[in-house]
Regions:
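C-terminal substrate-binding subdomain of Rossmann-fold SDR/epimerase-dehydratase oxidoreductases
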Residues: 1-109
């Protein structure tokens, strides 16, 4: 990628668009977790409906993703989280947990 061409510009970095439930099902499969853990809740006001990133401008400079959804990228991510529990376990308590309890408790009832 030519950095001279890219200087001062904004680029989106992404891969192929996937439905949220496709990602959820794959994570459940990779972790061996039960699909019964999935709970559908009412959307909160302003909740994002989708995440779609167009990286064609960046691809025009020669950038290509190193991983894809189907070629091991998600597996590597799940493995990283398994190996770095000390990084994410603290978010299950304290202010972060209180925030999610406030946002979702009524919708999960």
């Amino acid at each position: 990628m030519s950095t001279a061409e890219a200087e001062g510009r904004v680029y989106n970095v992404g891969g192929q668009e996937r439905e949220n439930m496709d990602v959820v099902r794959r994570i459940l499969d990779l972790t061996g977790a039960s699909p019964d853990l999935v709970r559908h809740v009412e959307d909160r006001p302003g909740h994002d409906r989708r995440y779609s990133v167009d990286s064609s401008k960046l691809s025009g400079l020669g950038w290509q993703p190193k991983h894809s959804f189907d070629s091991g990228g998600l597996e590597e991510t799940v493995d990283w989280y398994r190996e770095h529990r000390d990084w994410w376990e603290p978010i299950k308590s304290g202010d972060y947990k209180r925030y999610y309890d406030e946002q979702y408790a009524a919708r999960l009832a």
